[in-house]
């Protein structure tokens, strides 16, 4: 069982207070996002109020609090990334935030599988995707094969890149 409210501290100071769900889904810093679970981080640059350029890809996300040209870190939880073999096209209205990737490794963890992806057009780091085992069986995932990933804009957190 977990507490009703969590106080997250760093260097002796409280940096966020909220319910477990609030802290997990709306962490107010990369430190908290990474501390309260696994997170994929992708570096990018703001190009307009709803878009960041990450590698070779434009990602739709909420960049309204950042200036054009500002370096940012996009963050998305492994369970929020959607896998598909279907190529999304501009005519079906879902082309935004769809990236081609290659499956690097699949780790079976019982009720879910963790899939490590090489999404080179987006980031040089491997991305992690957690998918229920039943869904993974339906997709017939195999290492060294291509897959399409979708990053739902509503699940992407944007942070200033402080590096």
Residue ranges, per PLM feature:
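Non-catalytic connector elements of ABC transporters
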Residues: 39-41, 49-163
